[in-house]
């Protein structure tokens, strides 16, 4: 990934008038690109792997909706730039998507610190997530957040193995109340390989 695709600045973004005109097309392109950057885990959670383009789309959309000007732009860049992979990591938004509020509260209350027990397994080696340190995602009562921002920091040999399409790559958690594993498809792997350079 070229260095210019590791950090977004104002010159990467469309002005609101242009974005408004092109929004429908841009959103279709983003949906298509995200298709192979998504992995479901168990009955309630999904990983959405981020990159320069997903974060750029998120910032554009937030600016379009909230119209907060330069101050908002600074805040959005500060919030989303750290979620762009740096070339030796994968970055994911890990979401628990539970519609029923009672079920959601019950599940999240049983999953304290799940963010610290989440991993990608490459060639038998677990790479545990490093949560984004913006705020604690598990509160004092042990209830976790429904949204986590996770960095999976790879060593060179992990990247090499990940790029081998014959190598099985899994994602999962070691949490006692959510011991699920998913195998990444070759389509997902092919999309995520582009995050390494």
List PLM regions with ranges.
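Long, contiguous binding/interaction regions
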Residues: 2-89, 97-197
């Amino acid at each position: 990934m070229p260095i210019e695709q590791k950090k977004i600045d104002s010159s990467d973004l469309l002005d609101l008038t242009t974005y408004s005109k092109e929004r429908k097309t841009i959103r279709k392109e983003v949906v298509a690109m995200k298709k192979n950057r998504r992995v479901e885990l168990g009955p309630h959670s999904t990983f959405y792997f981020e990159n320069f383009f997903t974060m750029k789309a998120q910032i554009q959309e937030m600016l379009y909706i909230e119209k907060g000007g330069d101050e908002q732009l600074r805040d959005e860049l500060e919030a989303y730039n750290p979620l762009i992979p740096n070339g030796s990591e994968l970055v994911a938004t890990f979401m628990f998507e539970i519609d029923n509020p009672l079920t959601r509260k019950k599940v999240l209350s049983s999953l304290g610190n799940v963010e610290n027990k989440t991993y990608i397994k490459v060639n038998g080696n677990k790479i545990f997530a490093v949560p984004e340190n913006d705020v604690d995602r598990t509160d004092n009562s042990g209830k976790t957040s429904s949204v986590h921002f996770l960095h999976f920091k790879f060593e060179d040999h992990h990247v090499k193995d990940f790029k081998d399409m014959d190598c099985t790559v899994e994602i999962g958690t070691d949490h006692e109340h959510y011991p699920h594993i998913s195998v990444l498809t070759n389509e997902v792997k092919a999309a995520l390989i582009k995050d390494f350079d």
